[in-house]
């Protein structure tokens, strides 16, 4: 879930890559193509995992003329994008919204022609956090923050003086890449502890299920980390970066007719599943293989420049099948990849060097209340609950006002709420029973919104591994992924373990992996042609 505007904390995790040149349409029968000097359009690429990263990677590969097979062990595509329609209600059990903060998302939307299906939330700038047991409207800009009562006068003064009084990390060079500073330590150095407790803490809980003490600043907020490296002061650096960005955008407007990106968060008509379904329509039955579990990967390159160095073994309906490919894009969770059987030139290739990644559990509870039984309804996006508010009896991470944002998600006489419980704050509570969670959610909503009586509808969905935790040692995970890609030519990794947790970052990760695969295949083709 995302409640705070991402732009307030500038959490761009992506790196742009130059898009490869479009190629000819896909050729027909694979067995008929020239093995010595194939056009790239005859190459075959396997994509393992049909979450949003896998779908994006497969779409990018196919749009460049490649033969693609997308393997998914589950009976449905989309991963953690999952919309349910039931009893006149529409809700998402995974991500509820996304942003268009990455150019890869813009490219995908334009190619799919899906913009007419975008659904913008009503009053999305009205977002709340709990303070002293009650919801408080979150200021939408720095000036409003200084005028509000959300922070003490001391904290406001520290924010205003940050350009002059910010502190370096333990007196060391700020740009020391070995520093494993937490999100809490970083923001406390710049803005103080209250800023962390009542703004950063609920934000990271709402976007990643994490807590600021456990998250790595460099990996959770790399743009702000880099701003400090360049400018020292976060405020000064942010202002200078924005001014520079405006100049660049001004130049782009004069030289191109690019469509402006959607500002803020949005969903789709019918929920986030609409994005998944739209992408899936681009693939035939032979390309998108559901309930097909990949058992093993085998790399057989022996030094000669021949195609189809990869073999993918998969099982569907108790039938095991081996198929040859020229490259593989893997998008499964890294802990699952670690357990995958891989052979390299007929020898087992161990992935023991990949560290275990801690993943955070999350329960999603959907409730409805008759409007007459909600005495203090709030218009807007939702409310986040800081960890400190547990002392005031609040146990949830936050609640989205789903039918306030999107009125078509529920009948006109009820309010639909989406509440989140668990994360690193309370892993055990995430695993509680539906009845227990119903009582917890009802209690929090009664305190925050004045709900009365029992909800008229309850649905509970549990994600045992909702988010990977970008902890202080996350460098070791990224180095392991790089080693895997380096040691296994033609294998590329994508997903929310690499590049960011949001839907947009996951799409960008899939696109970038596809671009690397295309570059790899083009490079091999050029080498073959010179021989």
Curated annotation (Swiss-Prot):
Stored Pfam families: Amino_oxidase (PF01593)
A cellular component annotation (GO) from this entry: mitochondrial inner membrane
Keywords: Chlorophyll biosynthesis, Chloroplast, FAD, Flavoprotein, Heme biosynthesis, Membrane, Mitochondrion, Mitochondrion inner membrane, Oxidoreductase, Plastid, Plastid inner membrane, Porphyrin biosynthesis, Transit peptide
InterPro entries given in the database record: Amino_oxidase, FAD/NAD-bd_sf, Protoporphyrinogen_oxidase, Zeta_carotene_desat/Oxidored
Enzyme Commission number, as recorded: 1.3.3.4
The organelle targeting sequence, given as a residue range: 1-48
Binding site for FAD: 49-54, 72-73, 94-97, 294, 501-503
Pathway the protein contributes to: Porphyrin-containing compound metabolism; protoporphyrin-IX biosynthesis; protoporphyrin-IX from protoporphyrinogen-IX: step 1/1; Porphyrin-containing compound metabolism; chlorophyll biosynthesis
Cofactor(s) in the UniProt record: FAD
Statement: the UniProt record of this protein carries the keyword Endoplasmic reticulum: no
Catalyzed reaction equations: protoporphyrinogen IX + 3 O2 = protoporphyrin IX + 3 H2O2
Gene Ontology terms, MF aspect: oxidoreductase activity; oxygen-dependent protoporphyrinogen oxidase activity
GO biological process, one term: chlorophyll biosynthetic process
The keyword tRNA processing is assigned to this record: no
Effect of residue 27 to I: Targeted to chloroplasts only, due to lack of alternative initiation
Family, similarity comment: Belongs to the protoporphyrinogen/coproporphyrinogen oxidase family. Protoporphyrinogen oxidase subfamily.
Primary role: Catalyzes the 6-electron oxidation of protoporphyrinogen-IX to form protoporphyrin-IX.
Protein name per the record: Protoporphyrinogen oxidase 2
Organism encoding this protein: Spinacia oleracea
């Amino acid at each position: 879930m995302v409640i705070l505007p991402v732009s307030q904390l500038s959490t761009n995790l992506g790196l742009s890559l130059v898009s490869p040149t479009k190629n000819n349409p896909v050729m027909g029968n694979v067995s008929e193509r020239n093995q010595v000097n194939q056009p790239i359009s005859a190459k075959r690429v396997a994509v393992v995992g049909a979450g949003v990263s896998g779908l994006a990677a497969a779409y990018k590969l196919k749009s460049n003329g490649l033969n693609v097979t997308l393997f998914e062990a589950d009976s449905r595509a989309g991963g953690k994008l999952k919309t349910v329609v039931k009893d006149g209600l529409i809700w998402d059990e995974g991500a509820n919204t996304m942003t268009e903060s990455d150019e890869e998302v813009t490219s995908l939307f334009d190619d799919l022609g899906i913009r007419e299906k975008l659904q913008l939330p009503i009053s999305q700038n009205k977002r709340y956090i709990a303070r002293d047991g009650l919801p408080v409207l979150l200021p939408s800009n720095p000036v409003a923050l200084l005028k509000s009562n959300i922070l003490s006068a001391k904290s406001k003064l520290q924010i205003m003086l940050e350009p002059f009084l910010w502190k370096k990390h333990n007196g060391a060079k700020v740009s020391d890449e070995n520093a494993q500073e937490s999100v809490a330590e970083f923001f406390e150095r710049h803005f103080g502890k209250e800023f962390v407790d009542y703004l950063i803490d609920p934000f990271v809980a709402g976007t990643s299920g994490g807590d600021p003490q456990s998250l790595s600043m460099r990996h959770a907020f790399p743009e702000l980390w880099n701003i400090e490296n360049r400018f020292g002061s976060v405020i000064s650096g942010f202002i200078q970066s924005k001014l520079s960005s405006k100049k660049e955008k001004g130049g782009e407007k004069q030289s191109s007719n690019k469509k402006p990106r959607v500002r803020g968060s949005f969903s789709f008509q019918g929920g986030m599943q609409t994005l998944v379904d739209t992408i899936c329509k681009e693939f035939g039955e032979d390309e998108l293989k559901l309930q097909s579990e990949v058992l093993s990967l085998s790399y057989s390159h022996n030094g000669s420049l021949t195609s189809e160095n990869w073999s993918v073994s998969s099982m569907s309906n108790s039938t095991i099948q081996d198929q040859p490919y020229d490259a593989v894009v893997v998008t499964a969770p890294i802990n699952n990849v670690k357990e995958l059987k891989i052979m390299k030139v007929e020898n087992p290739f161990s992935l023991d060097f990949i560290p275990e990644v801690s993943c955070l559990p999350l329960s999603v509870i959907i409730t409805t209340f008759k409007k007459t039984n909600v005495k203090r309804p709030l218009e807007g996006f939702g409310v986040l609950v800081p960890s400190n508010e547990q002392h005031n009896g609040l146990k949830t991470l936050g609640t989205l006002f789903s039918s306030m944002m999107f009125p078509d998600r529920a009948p006109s006489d009820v309010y639909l709420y989406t509440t989140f419980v668990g994360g690193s704050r309370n892993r055990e509570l995430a695993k509680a029973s539906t009845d227990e969670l119903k009582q917890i959610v009802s209690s929090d909503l009664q305190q925050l919104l004045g709900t009365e009586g029992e909800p008229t509808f309850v649905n509970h969905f549990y994600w045992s591994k909702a988010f990977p935790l970008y902890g202080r040692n996350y460098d070791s995970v990224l180095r392991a992924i790089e080693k895997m890609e380096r040691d296994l030519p033609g294998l590329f990794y994508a997903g929310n373990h690499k590049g960011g947790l949001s839907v947009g970052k996951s799409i960008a990760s899939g696109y970038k992996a596809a671009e690397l695969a295309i570059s790899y295949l083009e490079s091999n083709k050029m080498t073959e042609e010179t021989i």
